[in-house]
A protein has these predicted regions:
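A short helix/loop element that forms part of the nucleotide-sugar donor recognition site in Leloir-type
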Residues: 43-45, 126, 176-188, 339
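Acidic donor-binding loop of glycosyltransferase active sites
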Residues: 143, 246, 262-281, 295
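Conserved acidic donor-binding segment of nucleotide-sugar-dependent glycosyltransferases
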Residues: 311-312, 316-323, 332-338
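Conserved donor-binding/catalytic core segment of Leloir-type glycosyltransferases
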Residues: 4-7, 146, 188-215, 344, ...
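Nucleotide-activated donor-binding/catalytic signature segment of Leloir-type glycosyltransferases, i.e.
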Residues: 225, 233-260
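Membrane-proximal helix-turn-helix segments that form the acceptor-binding/catalytic region
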Residues: 71-79, 94, 98-102, 126-145, ...
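Donor nucleotide-sugar binding/catalytic pocket of nucleotide-sugar-dependent glycosyltransferases
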Residues: 36, 53, 132-178, 249
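Nucleotide-sugar donor phosphate/pyrophosphate-binding loop at the beta->alpha transition
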Residues: 64-68, 116-137, 203
Length: 371
């Protein structure tokens, strides 16, 4: 049986894009092995239909972490048989590329974001140069690659001449759990529920301003679900503003559990700031999660996110990132019943069209090139 090794640098638990890629490869008859890492605070792995391997590392962040993971991944790939390699993001690309050449194995590269233009790198030019060199070495040598949206695909094509396919981060309709109720999930029944979710609740994504806006919204309750480097700051802000009764933090959780909470929200948030190319052109999972959950969206005016919101009429935009402006936009989104009716119609149409059952055909066609 033909075998594919799929690699990613996270702990596998909540990466829905990689999970869908693995399941799609299984449909083409591949035996799948997914490789990632296990952190000290990683949740246990859920049951999968394919094999997984999480490597325990000595380092959990910084240059030694990236170096250790890449070296460990290189030797893992070297000593494990595969007919195909799927590399997810730039931080796994180098060992996959070297092994593909060394063992004459085909490699697929899937870039989940515009890695070299993330704020974590833009603010550290020396580190950014290292990753740009890796990108500049690997990507031009690939016949084709995959990424998450048209804008990023165009950037890669213009810069490196590589053929770039677009597969969006869209959930399956079948993955949505039955809608529950506030009481069963211990949520306040007398408040408007709001949700900010994701595994990348990081700097420059508007989370701080959203939390600050909650001091002006005494009839609202914000659920912050997931992980990210800005969470300690958010928790301190909540304590300093004395709004513990309005903001509740929940850890990363399995997708079905997260969506059970998301479905009960009246508004979901995508407030990334247009401070770097990665955020400007982002098309995050949560956009499509909100669509499938039937939750109208409050967003900043980002290129790809804005296209979807305007096309389907499924939400509204903040004028700026001032907390009072955000609070005013939230109040508008909750109180305008006629617009909410329009949004619900748009969400129903978008959910029918923007689902994995449709999007997976694009990925199947790409993978068939490598059979």
């Amino acid at each position: 049986m033909k075998r594919v090794i799929v690699s990613v640098i996270n702990d596998l638990v909540t990466d829905q894009r990689v999970n869908k890629s693995c399941i799609t490869l299984q449909k083409l008859g591949y035996e799948v092995l997914l490789v990632g890492r296990k952190q000290r605070k990683s949740p246990p792995m859920d049951q999968r239909s394919y094999d997984t391997k999480r490597m325990k590392l000595l380092f959990e962040k910084g240059p030694f972490f990236y170096a250790e993971y890449n070296i460990r991944l290189f030797f893992f790939l070297l000593f494990h048989k595969a007919n195909l390699l799927l590399s997810n993001d730039l931080d796994t690309a180098l060992p996959n590329y070297f092994i593909s050449k060394l063992k004459c194995i085909k490699m697929i590269y899937d870039s989940h974001e515009y890695f070299t233009e993330t704020p974590e790198l833009v603010d550290r030019p020396r580190v950014q140069r290292v990753w740009k060199r890796i990108e500049g070495f690997v990507v031009p040598r690939l016949p084709e690659m995959i990424t998450v949206c048209e804008s990023i695909a165009e950037l890669f094509h213009e810069k490196y001449g590589v053929k770039c396919h677009v597969v969006r981060n869209i959930p399956a309709r079948a993955a949505l759990p039955p809608k529950g109720n506030k009481k069963a999930l211990n949520l306040p029944e007398d408040k408007h529920l709001l949700v900010l979710q994701g595994s990348g609740i990081n700097i420059q994504r508007g989370a701080e301003e959203l939390v600050e806006a909650m001091q002006y919204l005494d009839d609202c309750f914000l659920m912050v679900i997931g992980g990210g480097d800005v969470l300690p700051i958010l928790k301190q802000m909540v304590a300093d503003l004395h709004i513990e009764d309005r903001v509740h933090f929940m850890p990363r959780m399995p997708y079905a559990n997260m969506m059970a909470y998301t479905q009960l929200a009246e508004l979901g948030f995508i407030l990334d700031k247009d401070t770097n190319l990665n955020y400007r052109f982002c098309l995050p999972n949560k956009l499509f999660d909100f669509i499938q959950a039937g939750v109208p969206i409050v967003a900043s005016r980002l290129v790809e996110v804005g296209k979807i919101i305007e096309k389907y009429q499924i939400g509204l935009f903040i004028p700026d990132h001032d907390p009072k402006s955000i609070a005013a936009t939230i109040k508008e989104g909750l109180s305008d019943t006629s617009r909410r009716a329009v949004w619900q119609q748009g969400l129903a149409k978008a959910a029918e069209e923007l689902c994995w059952e449709n999007e997976q055909q694009v990925l199947l066609d790409i993978y068939k090139h490598y059979e």
